[in-house]
A protein has these predicted regions:
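N-terminal carbohydrate-binding accessory modules
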Residues: 1-62, 73, 88-92, 96, ...
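Short, well-ordered coil/turn segments that N-cap beta-strands
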Residues: 28-30, 57-59, 91-97, 159-164, ...
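The substrate-binding groove and active-site-proximal loops of carbohydrate-active enzymes
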Residues: 31-41, 64-81, 128-147, 172-176, ...
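Short, acidic/polar
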Residues: 40-55, 146-152, 274-285, 344-352
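Polysaccharide-binding and catalytic clefts of secreted carbohydrate-active enzymes
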Residues: 123-291, 295-298, 302-308
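Carbohydrate-binding surfaces of carbohydrate-active enzymes
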Residues: 221, 264, 294-738
Length: 738
């Protein structure tokens, strides 16, 4: 186990464009740019590229991500001349470089000579060249060639004045996280030996007494390849853990070379915290990096903006609320969804600034210039096929100006909320395995629904990995926390006994770290803390539902119900099943936990939600639980749900990001502070605040820097206000908070 890497942001580059000129690198500012692929274009286009980059305010590009075949056209030949030229050209124009190690996709000569590097699927099929990322994470042959390239890149460019960071590979695991080859099998066995030491321990953990699976030699152990029936569930879970670790070990191998050759250059790689990308435990990977980077693409649907905010928030949690790098997102449509929807006016800036609101200090896109050929030619870029005379490029230039205005935000951290949602990769992986009570359960969707409910109520909530210290939070929501080892159970119990308020849901606490059921009734490890007992699950068929009455409202539960028995006198039933097989039984409960006496008395609680309410049904449930915990919205009642509030702080100032989630103007009353971006309403109308604090289009400029009054958020608009830092309120005891 490696120790966490200390946080380091972009290296300050060498001398170049004078500070303050458009496009100049400003160490204290937010970075702006894209993946840049000059090798796709004739040399004369490069000069136009840097001209347009300076016009847009680009300060950083990621370079050479898919350039292995260009850099090393054959096993024994190298061509760095074009890359030298590109690095020098960018540096001459004040544009810094996050330089990729170029190992993302092996060149054809390598896979032709060494087909043994190609991944294999669960059914034994080979993933052939012709796309990208066709390599086994555990292949010693691939690693030998890739690390040779990394060393050459580090030696050649480590001292280049444009270099500000190393970019390891690209989206590790996007297409090759699960490899079932013989290389993977050997590495899996080595990983299992390290984890369990003995076969007896492995047999016990995997429960191999079932179905005559007991192993008598390590060579008998295989990845969960295609089998006659459901593979062993703990074998599946361990293979997911191993696969994530194998990629992490590969990341570490590249990083070790880079740090040995160029110890002053920070190292990162781009995560993919978004949607159902779940094969990589990024909370564990973060310790390998100097700073976290992430790629995110909007997923169309009714929760598209919620999901964007959720993913940005979780990325901040993975980064321990330190600044992180948005390495990729899109200016408009992508190319890989069933229907690739173009962004509407205002969405380019709103989406980008939502990431900044949750801690991003760099905003970058895939890619700079939209490709003319290849699989991603219909994926938008900063310069579209239509060229610079397009609405999209004008929006790109406008966002660059806004990011320059937001320079004071750079280096600030996410201000802790009073509530948090716990996110756990083991529970995600395990709760969705086969041979379960239902295959309709979706872990991330349940977590997202709770986040949507927080947004609807206008209450800030952090999204944090399960290993996070929860002591600073008043309310912690842990949806479908399926895997609860004894240590996590004890942490949650201590949180509640210290006055915290825990909320968890159906199918939580059911198994330990080996996916073995906690015996004695559900919810297993959390049964005593919650003060309830469930004898068996009662999942619902498609089309079935159960009505629950809570606080006078009739709510619909789907997917899952449970016959909940209250076994502790301190449990209050907040919601009752009114229809279905569970009619008359408890559906939502809360146990009050009192510890200590006198001035040291604490009163916490542990609540349980036994059905799936969905994002809308959770709003009244969460409202009741937050009210009882004394957690309130910081937003005016009139804009809750329409506006998201995210807060960053540098200890002296807080930065309020107010995001208009609607397609209409929204007025936010009584917001004091300096307006860094957005519009303030004055007595004579709307004022557009510029970087020097004056207001355009009104006779009442300048606007007072610390003035109150209303903000007008344009449709899909974002305002940023700098205010004196407010102290984080201490946890409130509900006995005095009501």
């Amino acid at each position: 186990m490696s120790s966490p890497t200390p946080f380091r942001w972009l290296r300050r580059p060498g001398p170049h464009t004078p500070p303050g000129e458009p496009g100049a690198y400003t160490p204290s500012g937010l970075s702006y740019g894209a993946d840049y692929n000059p090798d796709q274009w004739p040399r004369e286009v490069w000069d136009e590229d840097v001209r347009l980059m300076r016009e847009a305010g680009v300060t950083v590009v990621s370079l050479a991500i898919f350039s292995w075949a260009r850099i090393q056209p054959t096993e024994d030949t190298w061509d760095f001349a074009w890359l030298d030229d590109a690095m020098d050209l960018l540096h001459a124009h004040g544009i810094t470089v996050d330089l990729a190690t170029a190992t993302a996709s092996p060149p054809p000569w390598l896979t032709t000579k060494h087909p043994e590097v190609l991944p294999q699927t669960r059914t034994g099929e080979t993933l052939w060249p012709g796309a990208r990322q066709q390599w086994r994470p555990t292949s010693p042959v691939f690693r030998e060639h890739a690390l040779r390239l990394v060393e050459r890149m580090a030696e050649r460019y480590g001292d280049h004045p444009a270099l500000v960071a190393w970019h390891v590979s690209n989206e590790l695991g996007c297409h090759n996280v699960y490899d079932f080859s013989d290389d993977a099998a050997a590495a899996f066995r080595a990983w299992l030996r390290d984890r369990y030491t003995t076969l007896d321990a492995l047999n016990a953990a995997w429960g191999t007494a079932f179905w005559s699976q007991r192993y008598s030699a390590w060579e008998q152990v295989l990845p969960p390849r295609l089998a006659a029936s459901h593979p062993n569930p703990t074998q599946q879970l361990d293979f997911k853990r191993f696969s994530s670790d194998a990629l992490r070990q590969y990341l570490r191998a590249e990083a070790e070379i880079l740090r040995r050759v160029t110890p002053d250059v920070p190292v990162t790689t781009n995560f993919m915290v978004m949607g159902e990308t779940k094969g990589m435990d990024y909370a564990a990977w973060a310790d390998e990096l100097d700073f976290v980077s992430n790629d995110h693409y909007v997923l169309p649907g009714p929760q598209a903006l919620d999901e964007l905010s959720f993913s940005a928030n979780l990325t901040g949690g993975i980064a321990r609320h330190r600044p992180w790098f948005l390495m990729e997102h899109s200016t408009s449509a992508v190319n890989w969804q069933p229907v690739n929807v173009a962004k509407k006016p205002g969405e380019l800036a709103r989406d980008s600034l939502t990431h900044v609101a949750h801690g991003a200090d760099a905003v970058c896109y895939f890619q700079w210039r939209q490709s003319a050929a290849g699989a991603e030619k219909y994926h938008s870029g900063m310069v579209p096929h239509a060229g610079e005379r397009s609405r999209l490029f004008r929006d790109v230039v406008a966002l660059g100006a806004t990011l320059r205005d937001l320079a004071p935000v750079a280096g600030s951290t996410q201000k802790p909320a009073r509530a948090a949602i716990v996110f756990d990769w083991d529970s995600w992986w395990t709760s969705e395995l086969d041979s379960h009570p239902t295959d309709r359960l979706r872990y991330r969707q349940e977590a997202l629904d709770w986040y949507s409910a927080f947004l609807a109520l206008g209450v800030r909530a952090d999204v944090v990995p399960s290993a996070t210290d929860l002591a600073t939070y008043d309310v912690v929501v842990a949806p479908v926390l399926h895997v609860v080892p004894a240590g996590l159970r004890d942490r949650l119990t201590a949180f509640v006994e210290a006055g915290g308020h825990l909320v968890t849901t159906y199918f939580s606490g059911v198994v330990d770290q080996d996916d073995h059921a906690w015996l004695g009734g559900y919810p297993g490890a959390l049964r005593d803390l919650l003060g309830i007992r469930v004898e068996e699950f009662a999942p619902l068929l498609d089309g079935e539902s159960a009505t629950v009455e809570l606080a006078g409202e009739q709510l619909e539960g789907t997917v899952w119900t449970e016959p909940v028995d209250v076994v502790d006198p301190d449990v209050e039933v907040l919601g009752w099943y009114k229809t279905g097989e569970q009619a008359g039984r408890a559906a939502v409960t809360r146990r009050t936990v009192r510890t200590g006496d006198g001035t040291g008395a604490r009163e916490g609680s542990a609540a349980y939600v036994s059905t799936r309410f969905g994002r809308q049904g959770l709003v009244p449930v969460l409202a009741r639980l937050l009210d009882d915990a004394g957690v309130r919205s910081e937003l005016p009642a009139a804009v809750r749900g329409d506006v998201e509030l995210a807060v960053r702080t540098d200890g002296t100032d807080d930065f309020w990001f107010l995001v208009n989630r609607t397609a209409r103007p929204v007025e936010v009353p009584d917001v004091a502070g300096d307006v860094l971006a957005g519009r303030r309403l004055t007595a004579s109308g709307t004022s557009a605040v510029t970087t020097d604090g004056t207001a355009e289009g009104t006779a009442e400029a300048p606007v007072e820097g610390t003035a109150g009054g209303a903000l007008l958020l344009e449709p899909r608009g974002v305002a940023v206000v700098r205010r004196p830092a407010a102290p984080t309120p201490p946890r409130k005891n509900p006995a005095t908070a009501r």
